[in-house]
Amino acid sequence: MGRAFEYRKARIMARNSKNSKAFSKFSKEITMCAKASGADPDNNSRLRVLIASAKSAGMPKDTIDRAIKKATDKDTSDYKEVTFEGYGPFGIAIVVETATDNNTRTVANVRSYFTKFGGSLGTSGCLSFLFTRKAVFTVKAKDGIDMDELELELIDFGVDELYKDDEDNTITAYGEPDCYAQMQQYFEENGFEIVSAEFTRIPNDTKEVTAEQRETLDKLLDKFDEDDDVTNVYHNIKEDEE
C-alpha cells in the first residue's frame, strides 16, 4: 500500500455530474443489474449495493423503485455497457464509459465530440496501459476504528489501498476489480454502512496543461457529460493546483 494520496487526487479525474445526471446513471445501472440478476436485492448483492449508493447520493426511493420495476417491463430497452477510448486535444487520454440502447447513435456522438475538439476516437483497449481499473468502496467509519488492524484484515479481501477521511468520517478502500464481491461481503458481514461502491479508472500518470488548454478540454469533457448515454468520463489531465 502507499498510493492513497494519488488515489485521492485521482477521484478528481473522474467527472462529477450534477444530481440529475447522477440519478440517470444510477437508474440505468439499477435497471441493468435487476434485469441481469434479479430484482430482489436480498438475492442480488450487486443490486443491493447500487441501491445503497443511490440512497447515499440522495436519489428518491420512488425513483429507485421505478428503476427496479423497469427491469421487469417487456417494453424496457436493453442497455449495453460500451467503453470508448481516445485522445482529446493536446494529447490528453480520455476514457468514456456509456450505457446505451443504440450503439450506432452513441458511437457517432462520441466520435463527433472528439473530432470537434481536434481529438480522435481510438480502438478498444488502446489506452488500457494508461489507467488502472479499481473497485472502490466507501463506508461509514465506526467509532474508535483501528485503521491499521482494518487494513491488515482487508488485505485478505483484495484491498490494496485504504484511507480515512476525517472530515466526513468515511473510509475508502481500493482493490482489484475482481475483488468487488469479496470486498462487499466483508463490509456487509462486519456491519459497515456502505456509502458508495463503484469501479473507477485511475491514471498512472498525469499531463500538465496550460490554463487555455484546460479551458478547451473542459468544454470537451462537458460535451461528454451532457450526453445521456455517458455514465463516466476519465482523463489524465494533471489537477489544477490553484
Where are these regions (language model features)?
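Positively charged, low-complexity, intrinsically disordered RNA-binding extensions
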Residues: 136-242
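N-terminal cationic and glycine-rich segments that engage phosphates or anionic surfaces
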Residues: 1-113, 118-122, 127-136
